[in-house]
Amino acid sequence: MKGFSTTIEINSNPNTIWEILTESSNYHDWNKSVEKIEGNIAVGEKIKVYAKISPDRAFPVKVKEFVPSSKMVWCGGMPFGLFQGVRTFTLTERNNGQVEFRMQEEFSGLMSPLIVRSMPDLTESFELFASSLKAKAESVA
């Protein structure tokens, strides 16, 4: 199974970070890896993510899990389990007043070996997402 992940420490609080992560209309203002998000980021909702690496292509996902200020899971892919991407965002409050932000995406399904072989390396995009979130959260903290 192929996947990508990034982790960063943010000098802010989980509620501030969560507000930034879940306000879809403002992604273009702070996120250097996401062009825009269409839709409402809430459990059960379908949203469309437009990444800067492919700004003309929408990635439709469904918000599967939504635990305020803690965890969010987006899922998207092909029907019948042929291919699925699961992106998980977690916020963990540390004793030192920082919050650990982790974002990971894992791919699975029967078509996964073929599809992931042609995918670009998303490591840089994930790190840019995390550093953009850190900069925004620390500027409003």
Segments the model singles out, each with a brief description of its role:
Residues T16-L21, Y27, I47-V49, V63, ...:
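Hydrophobic pocket/interface hotspot
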Residues E38, I53-E100, E106-G109, A135-K136:
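Hydrophobic-ligand binding "helix-grip"
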Residues K2, E45-I47, R87, V99:
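Short beta-strand micro-motifs in enzyme catalytic cores
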Residues I20, W30, D56-F59, Q84, ...:
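Alpha-helix N-cap/helix-start motif
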Residues E100, E106-A141:
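A conserved amphipathic terminal alpha-helix motif
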Residues M1-E38, A42:
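Hydrophobic ligand-binding cavity/cleft-lining segments
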Residues K36-N40, K48-Y50, S69, P120-T123:
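Juxtamembrane/interface motifs at transmembrane-helix termini
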